[in-house]
Amino acid sequence: MVLFFQIMVWCIVAGLGLYVYATWRFEAKVKEKMSAIRKTWYLLFVLGAMVYWTYEPTSLFTHWERYLIVAVSFALIDAFIFLSAYVKKLAGSELETDTREILEENNEMLHMYLNRLKTYQYLLKNEPIHVYYGSIDAYAEGIDKLLKTYADKMNLTASLCHYSTQADKDRLTEHMDDPADVQTRLDRKDVYYDQYGKVVLIPFTIETQNYVIKLTSDSIVTEFDYLLFTSLTSIYDLVLPIEEEGEG
């Protein structure tokens, strides 16, 4: 029994060391899995307590303070290591989560949104919108070129992809983690966001033909970008009648 718990303690210490190393090397991925990591951490406590209780059933009543000490130790490690908490008031032992990093990330996101919005406004005022009409393919070509022009200025990649046949659907989703799930969402006309925030797929229909607007980025693509680029398609429609009247 003693040997078992000694091995378990050293495994936990090794696991904590691995966690610290992973945080240095793969900080973003570790943050994504933080909820699962913390659940695993407390599961280890429960398993250890159950093993000890199995061999010493009366210990829960005669040595309950041992359970309490270990539980507090797990909670403190969770607070200081996993939640990056620090002591705010030494006398009151008050703990709070360090939110500085979160605020910095939010500030960066805000600046990114503002820069993209400014670029969007500048392009609308200074870049001509060339309209293609006469057929569905011509209209789609015009939309595709418009999206690519704006995306290039915003450090994004945009394309209008065919999505009518099963071959089109398979081609679009072949590199996705779960192609069937992505296709199901797009068939329901739901916007798809990948779990890493790098890809957004937006269902788009031109008369009887189905398309998907694909937005990708090396940094992040959000609902904000989805709204900007879908508004471009509406602007394109507003310009189209003017061009047609001019031809008449």
From Swiss-Prot:
One Pfam family it belongs to: SpoIISA_toxin
Stated role: Toxic component of a type II toxin-antitoxin (TA) system. Its toxic activity is neutralized by cognate antitoxin SpoIISB. Expression in the absence of SpoIISB permits sporulation to stage II, when plasmolysis zones and holes in the peptidoglycan layer are observed, resulting in cell death. Lethal when synthesized during vegetative growth in the absence of SpoIISB. In E.coli both the membrane bound and soluble domain are required in cis for toxin activity.
Family: Belongs to the SpoIISA toxin family.
Membrane topology classification: Multi-pass membrane protein
InterPro entries: SpoIISA_toxin
Record-annotated membrane-spanning stretches: 4-21, 42-64, 68-87
Annotated knockout phenotype: No change in sporulation efficiency.
Subunit structure: Probably forms an oligomer; X-ray data suggests the inactive complex forms a heterotetramer of SpoIISA(2)-SpoIISB(2), which inactivates the toxic activity of SpoIISA.
Main localization, broad class: membrane
Locations listed in the record: Cell membrane
Keyword Iron-sulfur recorded: no
Induction: Expressed at low levels during exponential growth, it increases dramatically at the onset of sporulation (at protein level). A member of the spoIISA-spoIISB operon.
GO process terms (BP): sporulation resulting in formation of a cellular spore
Protein name: Stage II sporulation protein SA
Annotated consequence of substituting R38Q: Loss of toxicity
Residue intervals annotated with topology Cytoplasmic: 22-41, 88-248
Extracellular face residues: 1-3, 65-67
GO cellular component entries: plasma membrane
Disulfide pattern: none
Keywords: Cell membrane, Membrane, Sporulation, Toxin-antitoxin system, Transmembrane, Transmembrane helix
Lineage: superkingdom: Bacteria
Record has 4Fe-4S as a keyword: no
Species name: Bacillus subtilis (strain 168)
Record note on what altering L103F does: In mut9; sporulation efficiency decreases by about 4 orders of magnitude
